[in-house]
């Protein structure tokens, strides 16, 4: 189950806890297609193992939970299908995590941006350190956009005005603001977060599994009822990903310079 970049570990069966650690700290835990697939496989394992009661996701190195998708792969995008296939792949991964039948906790240290932010939002609870930052800064970096489902996750937690604020400005919100907005459940100092998350997970794991499952699935169904099919947003995905601005954003990011966007 584990790979060098995705470490999956199940505690002693008596605890009921499973942990996934994204282990690519040299790249701020940026995700590749293989890493996304390993996350899906971990979700399958969690659902298949009755001894697992709670699933915790975290990033190695202390500087990033996950910083999203490895930007280098975007240099290969040239067609509408490239863009749609990428967003559908990411949607499938995040949706699979969201559908895990056991409670999930994102343990966030450092940044959770782009796809990493989407993964954190797909978890049931988020516990972070004071230095954590959340956001999807594509308006000032790459010039692309999110899938309908990932916009919906932001809307569920932040509401329309705050979602637009976050996306329009491209800013990252710190831990204190994230907690005020309801995005984060708890803030814990870095030297105590492992123990705090383990204690929270153990508390949940002692409770009635069917009640936990029913609560999680009921909330998911209620939220899903407000979402549109991704196909209804394909025109917006293609508009952004096939633009000159997106090509400029990717080139600028890889060259470590500010992008110059022209709206075309």
Locate predicted features.
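C-terminal long alpha-helix characteristic of the crotonase
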Residues: 25, 127-132, 184-231, 238, ...
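Short, active-site-adjacent cap segments at secondary-structure transitions
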Residues: 62-66, 112-114, 135, 219
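CoA-thioester-processing core
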Residues: 93, 97, 107, 113-166, ...
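Conserved CoA-thioester-binding segment of acyl-CoA-metabolizing enzymes
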Residues: 1-58, 95
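Well-ordered beta-strand positions
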Residues: 125, 165, 169-171, 177, ...
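Glycine- (often His-adjacent) and acidic-residue-rich active-site loop
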Residues: 40, 59-95, 140-143, 225
